């Protein structure tokens, strides 16, 4: 059952009444531009047809009762008291954190509610189940309290909740695309100015996602380490963020930085070249040059593997299998924060079955893990449903 239907049905069962407010926020897949968001750079994701639905209704007090359908767990907290983490249930941090920072922006918001949350974004897959949940909660609060927040505000509140309440030092891409996505379009986002430029996905091109089922958990260190290394590199170049370093500027001082700290130099090289790849990818898409876009995706994967060092052998193998079928008709790369999760492929629709088949025949045999294969549609951002 789709989360939109499930959340409504479960709400009636749990609370013996009908929901009066229903919202839905999609997950996302990033086509190109990995780890560039927290470097004030460029990204090019699309919202996907998997996401998080919330059904709810006002209460006549200040209490939030939250039922997470997929985990079969409840949480409750009050909006007229300080909102603090519930360490025994990690998922509650995404809900409580968003409500806390909505209140920080709109101190008058104290309206209680009963909620049911249902989602179908695979957890720990790199498809932004957390951002989808944060944006859905933010939109629910905005509509519940008729608050003066737009969808960009809601995205940034979600990011703040993940940074300061949950403790994952993520950038703003995942929340922005969940909030601002457009059907049938990729969205190039400037993560500094927050400007977005929609780019249509050609009709004959499929967006494929393959989940490696190698679990990743970004709160556990490596992601935050990469972020610190990028900040160290920005200081070395005397700039606010690596977004401000051109490839030429990087190459001039690359040997000097490598002598100081070879790992930091590699991390910076990925970010500086990846930003340029996103700009080149937007140009390629606007000129319907899918072959060039594919080259850029493939190069992005090599950079993540060798310079940013965030892939795994299983992920590299999936990419190799997909690329062997796609050839010059598109591309494939790891997507998401890394250390597991998913790969994304762009290719003509008539190649989908062959990609699915080569992975089904080889991946489990080599890794002992069974992949999940999704063909996705670029979808609308957060909305009432």
Swiss-Prot record:
Pfam families in the cross-refs: GalKase_gal_bdg, GHMP_kinases_C, GHMP_kinases_N
Compartment(s) of residence: Cytoplasm
Positions of substrate binding: 34-37, 223
Annotated ATP binding sites: 124-130
Active site (catalytic residues): 174 (proton acceptor)
Annotated GO MF terms: ATP binding; galactokinase activity; magnesium ion binding
Broad class of enzyme this protein falls into: transferase
GO biological process terms on file: galactose metabolic process
Ligand binding (Mg(2+)): 130, 162
Protein keywords: ATP-binding, Carbohydrate metabolism, Cytoplasm, Galactose metabolism, Kinase, Magnesium, Metal-binding, Nucleotide-binding, Transferase
One GO cellular component, as annotated: cytosol
Function summary: Catalyzes the transfer of the gamma-phosphate of ATP to D-galactose to form alpha-D-galactose-1-phosphate (Gal-1-P).
Family designation: Belongs to the GHMP kinase family. GalK subfamily.
Name of the featured protein: Galactokinase
Annotated organism of origin: Actinobacillus succinogenes (strain ATCC 55618 / DSM 22257 / CCUG 43843 / 130Z)
Gene responsible for this protein: galK
């Amino acid at each position: 059952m789709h989360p939109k239907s499930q959340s409504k049905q479960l709400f009636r069962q749990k609370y013996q009444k009908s929901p009066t407010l229903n919202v839905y926020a999609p997950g996302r897949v990033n086509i190109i531009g990995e780890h560039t968001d927290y470097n004030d750079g460029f990204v090019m994701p699309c919202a996907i047809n998997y996401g998080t639905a919330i059904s709810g209704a006002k209460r006549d007090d200040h209490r939030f009762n939250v039922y997470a359908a997929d985990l079969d767990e409840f949480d409750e907290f009050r909006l007229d008291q300080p909102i603090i983490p519930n360490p025994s249930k990690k998922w509650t941090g995404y809900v409580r954190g968003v409500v806390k920072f909505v209140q920080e922006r709109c101190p008058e918001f104290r309206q209680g509610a009963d909620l049911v949350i249902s989602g179908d974004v695979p957890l720990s897959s790199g498809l932004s189940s957390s951002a989808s949940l944060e944006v859905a909660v933010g939109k629910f609060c905005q509509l519940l309290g008729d608050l003066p927040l737009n969808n960009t505000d809601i995205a940034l509140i979600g990011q703040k909740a993940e940074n300061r309440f949950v403790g994952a030092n993520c950038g703003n891409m995942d929340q922005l695309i969940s909030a601002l996505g457009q059907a049938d379009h990729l969205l190039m986002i400037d993560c500094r100015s927050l400007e977005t430029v929609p780019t249509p996905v050609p009709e004959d091109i499929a967006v494929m996602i393959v989940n490696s089922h190698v679990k990743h958990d970004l709160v556990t260190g490596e992601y935050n380490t990469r972020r610190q290394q990028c900040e160290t590199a920005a200081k070395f170049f005397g700039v606010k963020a690596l977004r401000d370093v051109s490839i030429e500027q990087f190459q001039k001082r690359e040997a000097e930085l490598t002598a100081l700290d070879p790992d930091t130099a590699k991390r910076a090289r990925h970010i500086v070249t990846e930003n340029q790849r996103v700009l080149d990818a937007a140009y390629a898409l606007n000129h319907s040059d899918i072959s060039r876009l594919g080259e850029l995706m493939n190069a992005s994967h090599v950079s993540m593997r060798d310079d940013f060092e965030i892939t795994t052998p299983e992920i590299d193998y999936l990419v190799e299998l997909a690329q062997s079928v796609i050839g010059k008709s598109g591309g494939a790369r790891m997507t998401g924060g890394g250390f597991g999760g998913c790969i994304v492929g762009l290719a003509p629709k008539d190649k989908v079955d062959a990609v699915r088949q080569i992975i089904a025949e080889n991946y489990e045999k080599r890794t002992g893990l069974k992949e999940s294969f999704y063909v996705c549609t670029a979808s609308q951002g957060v909305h009432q449903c």
